[in-house]
């Protein structure tokens, strides 16, 4: 995953080292252009600070380097936008899944992925619980 504006490139080998959690309240990273209901619901349920940022790669890497703890995307994206960020996040030991908790599946005929979750392992169940509750109320 390349972040040219920061002069950074992330790969799976060597795997990034995930820093220890540094905040009392989790930080959720979301789209700079839109704030999906699911992200708002997770932020409210977990008492998260929310930060907006650009590309999917930049948001996922913010979790990898510890600038954020949760990235929820439910607006859909193509496999080529999420495959490398998912691989790097998994290599770093993060939780990566669809927002319903099912695994990400790549190399499908239809390249569209409706949603994406990257978070610290210890936050996966609370985030998925909040996402399930969000789906029930929408």
List where the protein language model places each region.
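DPxDG-like acidic metal-binding loop motif
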Residues: 1-14
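An extended, acidic
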Residues: 22-138
């Amino acid at each position: 995953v390349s972040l040219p504006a920061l002069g950074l490139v992330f790969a799976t080998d060597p795997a990034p080292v995930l820093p220890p959690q540094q905040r009392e309240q989790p930080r959720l990273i979301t789209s700079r252009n839109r704030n999906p209901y699911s992200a708002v619901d997770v932020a409210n349920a977990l008492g998260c600070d929310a930060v907006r940022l650009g590309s999917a790669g930049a948001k996922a890497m913010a979790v990898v380097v510890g600038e954020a703890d949760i990235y929820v995307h439910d607006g859909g994206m193509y496999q080529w936008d999420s495959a490398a960020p998912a691989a790097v996040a998994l290599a770093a030991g993060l939780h990566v899944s669809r927002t319903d908790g099912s695994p990400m599946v790549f190399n499908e005929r239809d390249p569209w992925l409706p949603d994406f979750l990257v978070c610290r392992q210890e936050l996966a169940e609370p985030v998925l619980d909040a996402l399930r509750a969000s789906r029930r109320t929408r």
